[in-house]
Amino acid sequence: MGESDAYYNGGQQQQYNGGYQQQYQPQPPAASYQAPPQQPYQQQPYQQGPPQNGTGNGNGYMPAQGYNANEKGSFDEQFKIAKPKYNDLWAGILLILVFAGFVVVSGLALQGYSANKGNAGDGIYNNKNDFSPNTSTVILFMFVLAVAFVLSYAYVWMARLFPKQFIWVTGILNVCWAIGTAIFYLWRKYWSAGIVFLIFGLFMAFCFWTWISRIPFSALMLKTTIDVSKKYGHVYLVSLIGGIIATAFSAWYAITLVGIYVKYQPAQDNPSCADGGCGKGKVIGLIAFITFAMYWFSEWLKNTIHTTIAGVYGSWYFNPHNFPKDATRASAKRALTYSFGSIALGSLLVAIIQFLRQICNAARNQEGADGSFVGYAIFCCISCLLGLLEWAVEFINRYAFCHIALYGKAYFAAAKDTWKMIKDRGIDALINDCLIGPVLSFGALFIAYACALLAYLYLYFTDPAYNSDGQYTAVVMAFSFLIGFQIANVFTTPISSGIETIFVAAGWDPQVMWRDHPELYNEMVRVYPKVQQVIKDR
């Protein structure tokens, strides 16, 4: 398991400096709950964190009221921040300004679209606009949104109803779908899309084959999070609300995108160009801005949902017999107030990388359409490198936001503390062997493939005049893929949030796992024996 193996096998106990907290000593419960028998060896809570934020309670983790079974405390009492403040406020303000800019651009674009509605058309066929995407494209995007919403919602419910079979079904269907659509595109001689989808399909088939041995552990963790979500908090309600917001914003983005083309695309028969306000550079610049804004807002929404759900699962882990009555509401409030800037900052880093990847993919598709295989290969390599960078930043984000959800620290400090804990505890071994993150990415890709295929078929059968030479096929498919992928990611966020929070919480205080969740701990040891080295036998 890489560094974690060296850590385990070296036989050296982590040496800590002075001034760290005392080992948490659990108080006997006041009700009839019987604690498991005392283990012969007790692993101390992680001594270098998490930060106490001025509370001075001295424990290895924050909740101080978690074991009084006769009284339910609130989330804010159990995860108290003594001196709360708005962290990384500049990033939150910048997000608001970017969103305001999106609103302004959208208003201008929609005003132009409305003023030229007769030219843009009011249906799928017989539109006068033959120089840019028009009302027919808007209708296409509405179909894409509907498909993305329905498939994403069904995918989450499949995970809820069949957690054990979920991983197998996702992997097999995704590989078959990717390769099948690739063959279809190649048959249609749409070489750029066919080659890309074929490469992805074969790569995913290889990955899934290498993951088979890790499926039992992953299935156990998925089943655990699903079971918790059915009993505590409002996990699926948060997922549904987030999905609705993501779908509505994507619809807004899609209409704005078409409006920019209608208002600013230079063409002799474009009535909007009568005052000389059109220009290809203006179209490219505005589309780049709204696409970046869409990436950032979508990431912020996804991470806000993740942080909210992390508060729910953190409450369950530390207080299974005294679950706070307002966990979901209070966690969401903290994510939208004190942690708003921190979530915006982490989301900004990912949005920048995603935006660069989108530019790279557009350039790659253009090179493929022009028949330049050298340029196509170069942009493929750059896209892969950006993909690796995006994965690394998202990995850090996911676990840092679990820390932020419970302890309210600033982004960079939380990321640093959490990363150090993960490496010192060897939690990275559990994370690497849990497939839920990749499986959910597979599911999101499946939905994105479906949306892209729908866009291709729509353009093929309707044959709009503006796409007579196929010049907009790659653009429309790319944005359809993007919309489907982002909506699916928002819907599935709560599923992975639970597992990630359990891993982080187990790293901060492993004692809680085998003391308050003995059945889960024993089952984890059965399917993945190395858990003992991470959670107890250190």
UniProtKB/Swiss-Prot annotation:
Chain positions carrying an annotated carbohydrate: N134
Membrane topology label: Multi-pass membrane protein
Pfam families registered for this protein in UniProt: Choline_transpo (PF04515)
Record flagged with keyword Glycoprotein: yes
One MF annotation (Gene Ontology) recorded for this entry: transmembrane transporter activity
Membrane side Extracellular: residue ranges: 110-137, 187-191, 261-280, 357-372, 456-474
Region named Disordered: 1-67
Cysteines joined through disulfide linkages: none
Keywords: Cell membrane, Glycoprotein, Membrane, Transmembrane, Transmembrane helix, Transport
One cellular component term from this protein's GO annotations in UniProt: plasma membrane
Spans traversing the lipid bilayer: 89-109, 138-158, 166-186, 192-212, 240-260, 281-301, 336-356, 373-393, 435-455, 475-495
Cytoplasmic side: 1-88, 159-165, 213-239, 302-335, 394-434, 496-538
Intracellular or extracellular location(s): Cell membrane
Magnesium in keyword set: no
Compositional bias of kind Low complexity: 1-54
Principal subcellular localisation of the protein: membrane
InterPro entries registered for this protein in UniProt: Choline_transptr-like (IPR007603)
Family named by the database record: Belongs to the CTL (choline transporter-like) family.
Main function: Probably involved in transport through the plasma membrane.
Protein name: Protein PNS1
